[in-house]
Amino acid sequence: MAQARNSRIKVGIVGGTGYTGVELLRLLSQHPDVELTAITSRKEDGLPVAEMYPNLRGHVKLAFSAPEKASLTDCDVVFFATPHGVAMAQAQALTAAGTRVIDLAADFRLQDTASFERWYKMPHGCPDILAKQSAYGLVELNRAAIAQAQVIGNPGCYPTTVILGLAPLLERKLIDTQALIADCKSGVSGAGRKAEVASLFSEASDNFKAYGVAGHRHHPEITEQLEKLAGGKVGLTFVPHLVPMIRGMFSTIYARILPEARETDFQALFEERYAGEAFIDVMPAGSLPETRSVRASNNLRIAVQRPGNGDQLIVLVVQDNLVKGAAGQAVQNMNLMFGLPETTGLNQVAILP
């Protein structure tokens, strides 16, 4: 495991103009052990970051720079808040220089390169790094590997909720692995900061719709991790929805209890599994989570319900898709990689109303 440092961690961000990029900036600008040294954007080269994002005035004094101008190999770690394919094109040079990489896109999430190529329509650029130097960045399940890795594939937002919602059940083999359902809702910020008809206010406001029902890129990521936990194939129906809020995610997960597991105390199971996890809150029995209770925080809340004490178990999970579902989780990974307490720079309380 990386040892705690005497100096601040030199951090670069590639792709700092999107929603996950600015969320990284918000969190890292308040991190006591971080020195922001480079924030790249080819389009915004020379523009002060605070001019694009006024909330960062007085906190981030850097200007965006074109990628070729930034000395990324001088950084201790570089975050990629970029489209798929960008991080893997630069990972070889960065890791060769001793710089660690945390990718918030999908380049290092899937270990199966054939699956990656099928879903993302591009060949994998560095399969050797993927196989030998990378780790899937879901800290609560993968601490040892993350601490040693040179490259982290930061999990997708939907996968974070579904995997953590099912992990205690799959680890103990308590549910039918062929009958899993994940009914998930995300705020529109999950679509990114780009001009797109579906994200326009007139399209997204007062509207609720499903998308990606025939196949979503997060499906293979979820199933790959669930199958590791289950020790075999799983059958998952995953349906994402877009809801008219800016940030937040609510996943309702359905699982059928196996006959031999009917006497299990599922509330106690979840409480014990996540005891001591700083960012996972298993709510009291009978409680129901709300997205606003985690807004702008790195917390993920879980509630477990068993209607009528029957054979159907319902796991309800909420998170902020931009924080625990993206930038906050990435900072949590960085903390672990550099021997810091996982909570460093991530103790923000959710904002209300």
Curated annotation (Swiss-Prot):
One of its GO terms (biological process) is L-arginine biosynthetic process. GO terms for molecular function: N-acetyl-gamma-glutamyl-phosphate reductase activity; NAD binding; NADP+ binding. The keyword Oxidoreductase applies. It is found in: Cytoplasm. SUPFAM superfamilies: Glyceraldehyde-3-phosphate dehydrogenase-like, C-terminal domain, NAD(P)-binding Rossmann-fold domains. It comes from the Bacteria. Its main location: cytoplasm. Keywords: Amino-acid biosynthesis, Arginine biosynthesis, Cytoplasm, NADP, Oxidoreductase. Transmembrane segments: none annotated. One of its GO terms (cellular component) is cytoplasm. It catalyses: N-acetyl-L-glutamate 5-semialdehyde + phosphate + NADP(+) = N-acetyl-L-glutamyl 5-phosphate + NADPH + H(+). InterPro entries: AGPR_AS, AGPR_type-1, NAD(P)-bd_dom_sf, NAGSA_dehydrogenase, Semialdehyde_DH_NAD-bd. The active site is at 157. Its EC number is 1.2.1.38. Pathway: Amino-acid biosynthesis; L-arginine biosynthesis; N(2)-acetyl-L-ornithine from L-glutamate: step 3/4. The keyword Metal-binding does not apply. Belongs to the NAGSA dehydrogenase family. Type 1 subfamily. Catalyzes the NADPH-dependent reduction of N-acetyl-5-glutamyl phosphate to yield N-acetyl-L-glutamate 5-semialdehyde. This is N-acetyl-gamma-glutamyl-phosphate reductase. It comes from Bordetella avium (strain 197N). The gene is argC.
